[in-house]
Amino acid sequence: MNKKLNILRLTVLLLLLAMLAACSSNGRKKHFVIAVSQCSEDVWREKLNEELRIAALYHNNVELRIKSANDDVKLQTEQIDRFADDNVDLLIVAPGQVTISPAIDRAYEKGIPVIIFDRRTRSDKYTAYIGADNKEIGTSMGEHLASVLPNGSNILELCGLSTSSPAIERQQGFDSVVALRPTISIVQKLHADWTEQGAYRVVDSLLSHPYKSFDCLFAHND
């Protein structure tokens, strides 16, 4: 996590320096607005917000605006559209779901530099993407389980939000390995939407009814 946060801070600083250099060529000191659209609120994302605030402190003519959508796609779309209407100088987005893509596209098409963080969109209309290789994460987990589980083992896959790119890519990577390993199999997939409460809910529901036994639980969360 710290590596991704530092990379994001460095990327923001580099973009700021580029904008400041362009500004200094004509002798004027412009006021820059950086907008951040967070899909949700948690300790991890608050740490990210803190890192961005630190980066912004290096420049007294930089204003940082942070909004959280609390896992509401409609709200995040509205927040991104408002940022675009305000013609912010830089937009950083952690998309809640891939369905948020049109709003990001609209901002990018207005000429606003866009950094996508943590989760991908459906298009390539962004300036930079910072995130994990989620397909490789799923592949690595599949290969590890295939090497340590006994033949005939059954796996319960606890997935993240079905419309978020990390869940989609981790599932693709994991399932691609299992498909080639006849010694292990996935008996069921549950979707917990990246929340602790959701994970408890779906697993408790499974265990309260007759279910096919499993030897291992693979959860998408990191």
Which functions belong to the PLM regions below?
Residues 11-19:
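Bacterial N-terminal signal peptides
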